[in-house]
């Protein structure tokens, strides 16, 4: 890697870190690491961004905005014992909510999310090329609906459409937990 490329990547990382802090309106710790995807730790307030070679600035902007959505809207509470829902189910519903809220807060972000998810879909980031999406479990289809549903057709039965709508209508974390419990219960039945 030449000096220009290394310097450009460093500046880009600094810019994305500053963007995260500005959007979150707090002095988050922003780390750039060799990880599979971005994440945000609500307890330590650490936002981790992956070092991807093939992703555009638009994808990084979306990753930053998504994780800032968690920083702004996902509370740091211990809900696992009380609700007894696997975190992966809550994350699917919470992702839909925080993306809706961050796009509502920053009017320029809907286009960023649209373009970034289009790019990720084009790169087969979700590894769907050899799969029939309709054969996937409901939680996976729900997740895909809210991420790349603009670019693929996903079939849902009547009850699943109700759960999709409930997910899209969540405004509070308490509502996320209620809907997540319904999604989890349905998925358990789906496996029987």
Identify what each model region corresponds to:
Residues 1-192:
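Short, functionally important secondary-structure microenvironments
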């Amino acid at each position: 890697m030449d000096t220009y490329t290394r310097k450009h990547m460093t500046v880009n990382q600094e810019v994305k870190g500053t963007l995260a802090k500005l959007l979150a309106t707090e002095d988050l710790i922003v780390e750039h690491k060799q990880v599979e995807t971005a994440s945000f730790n609500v307890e330590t307030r650490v936002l981790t961004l992956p070092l991807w070679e093939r992703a555009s600035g638009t994808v990084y902007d979306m990753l930053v905005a998504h994780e800032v959505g968690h920083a702004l809207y996902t509370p740091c509470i211990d809900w696992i014992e009380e609700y007894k829902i696997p975190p992966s189910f809550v994350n699917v519903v919470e992702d839909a909510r925080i993306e809706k809220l961050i796009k509502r807060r920053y009017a320029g972000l809907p286009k960023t999310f649209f373009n970034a998810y289009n790019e990720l879909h084009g790169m087969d980031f979700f590894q769907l090329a050899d799969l029939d999406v309709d054969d996937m479990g409901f939680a996976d289809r729900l997740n895909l609906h809210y991420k790349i549903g603009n670019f693929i057709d996903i079939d849902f039965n009547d009850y699943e459409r109700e759960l999709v709508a409930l997910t899209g209508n969540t405004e509070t974390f308490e509502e996320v937990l209620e809907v997540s419990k319904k999604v989890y219960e349905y998925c358990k039945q789906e496996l029987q």
